Curated annotation (Swiss-Prot):
<dbReference type="InterPro" id="IPR038363">
    <property type="entry name" value="LepA_C_sf"/>
</dbReference>
<dbReference type="GO" id="GO:0006412">
    <property type="term" value="P:translation"/>
</dbReference>
<keyword id="KW-0934">Plastid</keyword>
<dbReference type="GO" id="GO:0045727">
    <property type="term" value="P:positive regulation of translation"/>
</dbReference>
<keyword id="KW-0150">Chloroplast</keyword>
<dbReference type="GO" id="GO:0005525">
    <property type="term" value="F:GTP binding"/>
</dbReference>
<keyword id="KW-0648">Protein biosynthesis</keyword>
<dbReference type="InterPro" id="IPR027417">
    <property type="entry name" value="P-loop_NTPase"/>
</dbReference>
<dbReference type="InterPro" id="IPR005225">
    <property type="entry name" value="Small_GTP-bd"/>
</dbReference>
<dbReference type="Pfam" id="PF03144">
    <property type="entry name" value="GTP_EFTU_D2"/>
</dbReference>
<dbReference type="InterPro" id="IPR035647">
    <property type="entry name" value="EFG_III/V"/>
</dbReference>
<feature type="binding site">
    <location>
        <begin position="40"/>
        <end position="47"/>
    </location>
    <ligand>
        <name>GTP</name>
    </ligand>
</feature>
<keyword id="KW-0547">Nucleotide-binding</keyword>
<dbReference type="Pfam" id="PF00009">
    <property type="entry name" value="GTP_EFTU"/>
</dbReference>
<dbReference type="InterPro" id="IPR006297">
    <property type="entry name" value="EF-4"/>
</dbReference>
<keyword id="KW-0378">Hydrolase</keyword>
<dbReference type="Pfam" id="PF00679">
    <property type="entry name" value="EFG_C"/>
</dbReference>
Amino acid sequence: MTCAALLFRDTRSVPEKINLKVDGTLPSTMNLARNFSIIAHIDHGKSTLADKLLELTGTVQKREMKQQFLDNMDLERERGITIKLQAARMRYIMNDEPYCLNLIDTPGHVDFSYEVSRSLAACEGALLVVDASQGVEAQTLANVYLALENDLEIIPVLNKIDLPGAEPDRVAQEIEEIIGMDCSNAIRCSAKEGIGITEILDAIVTKIPPPQNTAISPLRALIFDSYYDPYRGVIVYFRVVDGSIKKGDKICFMASGKEYVADEIGVLSPNQMQVSELYAGEVGYLSASIRSVADARVGDTITHSSKRAECALPGYSQATPMVFCGLFPIDADQFEELREALEKLQLNDAALKAVTRFSMQFEPESSSAMGFGFRCGFLGLLHMEIVQERLEREYNLNLIITAPSVVYHVNLADGETVECSNPSLLPEPGKRRSIEEPYVKIDMLTPKEYIGPIMELGQERRGEFKEMNFITENRASVVYELPLAEMVGDFFDQLKSRSKGYASMEYSLIGYRESNLVKLDIQINGDPVEALSTIVHRDKAYSVGRALTQKLKELIPRQMFRVPIQACIGAKVIASEALSAIRKDVLSKCYGGDISRKKKLLKKQAEGKKRMKAIGRVDVPQEAFMAVLKLEKEVL
C-alpha cells in the first residue's frame, strides 16, 4: 500500500472515531486514564507527533493548529527545539470507552535532560520516537535509560517513514541491538503526513498501564512544573498521586509548610480549563494566589491542611549546574529588576541556580568593569543561552554574560578544600597546593567515515580515549574522558562540523582530577580587568592570551598615550600587545625660527603624555567586552 493510501485511510477513519472536544469530564474509573510522555533525540519529530496527537483527538481544532503547538515560547519555535516541558489532556474513544490521555511533552537536547526526568516521574509510559532515516542517537540512549530508571512501559515508534532515505527495518534492528528492546511490533509512522497516528493512540491505551487507584488515601500531589503569572501569582502543575483535590480545599506545601486555599484547579487540554475535582493519577494545574516563589517549589508535595499525608513524595534529584558565568545588566539601574527576574525564572526553570550564601538569597557579584550582577549556574551552554535570551525578552533586560567556567576544587596549603567557579576568587598560588577540575565521560555516535576527525577532536581537547564499539556495520560509538572545561566552548559545534552534522553526543560527570591549571589575567595599562580573567590549562595559556590581547588591540579606541595590553600568569607576562598613542602635531604652528623652540614643545608634549599615562584611565567600551567574552567562549 502506498503512503498516499495510508494517509487517506488514517484521515478518513480518525474523525469518525475520536474527533471529540475535551469537556473536562473525568473518566468513570482511573482504569481509563493513561499518563505518558514522548522522548526522543533533538529533531526526531517529537513536537510534530505531539501536534498530530492533539489534532486527531480533537483536543485542538484544525483551524487553531500551528507548528510546535505545545512550544509556547517564541524561542522554541525560532530554534525548532523544545525547552520547557508542557502538559496536555486528550480524550480518545476506543471500544466505546472514553479514555483520558495525559501527555507530558519533553525537551530533546542534552542540556534539558532534567526537564525530561521530571516529566517521566509523572508518567507510567513513554513513546520512544526514533528518526527512521537517522537511527539511534546519543540522546536517544540517555532518554531510554531515564525511562527505565522510572520503570516505564516504553513503546518504540519509528518516525519519518515518508522520507526517501528512511530505513525502518535497519533502525528497528539498531534499537534491538543497542537498547535490547523488542521492536518486532514497533509502530511505523510519519507524524508530518499523519501516517500511523491511530496505531500510536491504540498502543497508548493497550500497553501503558493505568495509574494506581489510591483515591481514598490522604492527598499527595507531586509538583512537576510551575510558572509565575503577574495577575494570579504562582501557577503550579502537578500530578495527583494519592487522594483527590477539589476547588476550595485548604492545602499545604509539605516542604515549605505554607498553607493556601485552592482558588482554581483544572486540566491542561492544552489550554487551562477549570474542573471541580481531580483524582489520583490525573494531571492538572492549581492557582491559590501564591505570591512568594519560594512557597511552591518543583518536586514539593501538596497535601490537605486538615488531613496531612504522613510523608512527602520522593520528588526529584537536584539538578547539578555544570557551567557558571556572571550576568551583569548593561544599565546599572536594572540590578534589582535582574534580581526579581532571576527569582521568577528560577521558579519555572528549576535547573537555573544562582550562587547563594543563604537559602533563597542571590549572592551579588561585583566587577570594577561591569558593576553589579549575579553568578549563575547552568546545565550547559545551550541552557545558558536560553536563560539569557529569556531574561532579555520576557523581562526587557539588557545583559552582558561573562565567559563560562566550571566548578574547580582548590586544595589549599593548610589541607582545606574549597570550591571555586569564579576565576577572580581563585586563591593566590602561594595559598593553594593543587587544583582539580571536573571530568566527563562523553559518548559520541558517528558514521564510520568520520571516526578519525572525531578522535582528533577528542585528543585536541585533552581527552583520554577509552573505547570504541561498532554498534552497527556503519556506525560507531567513540568514548572519551575529558575535562568539562574543554566542552563549554565550541566543542559541540566542532563535533557537528567535523562529522558534517551526522555525529551526536551524550555526556555524564564522572568526578574530579588534578590538573596543571593557572589563572590567566588580562591587564590594560597595568590595571587587571577582572571580568576577563579565566582559568586555563598551562599548555593553552599562551594561545589563549595571545588571542585575547590581539582582539582587545582591535577593539579598544586609541588614547593620547601608549596603552600596553598584557596577558599574565601571576607577575609573568606571557603575551603582550600595545595601542600606539595618538600623536598631536605640536609643531604645526612653528614656521621657522630656532630649533630650540621646537625641542621645547616636543619635550613638553612628552612630559604631558608621561603624566597622562600615569594617571590616565582606559575605558573599555561595552562592545569590546562583549566581543572579547564571545572570543573567550571560542578559544577556551
